């Protein structure tokens, strides 16, 4: 496995077939070069602007298995950056597309909660209610990278979860 998803998250997980490919993919993920990860998230409260960039410092609380936004001077704080844009809306929910620039513990969950837009179903980060399946409405939609051996561009896209709300919002994305 070249990267991880939080347990309640759905979507793309990338596996390497050889140790050589694993070593090269791990290096790409660590350097954040030649890898682009795109997530979709459903939030009840839309962010303050239809698109933006979030840049914070996160500190991981091991005991609570949670990250929080802190001052840059905080001991063990790590820089976290992502960009987002609203891609669809319904009467009660907003679908965001998120591109990670860094890959920190619970980064998307923590940064969206910090701007008042917790992910639907994410009780740990401020959602009012859990989802019926116990998951959260965060989906690893796509990974784009350069193949470590052939050097060809690869794009892997995961279908959205089989859920009425996901399908409703996907159908609301303008063409």
What are these regions (language model features)?
Residues 1-175:
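RNA pseudouridine synthases
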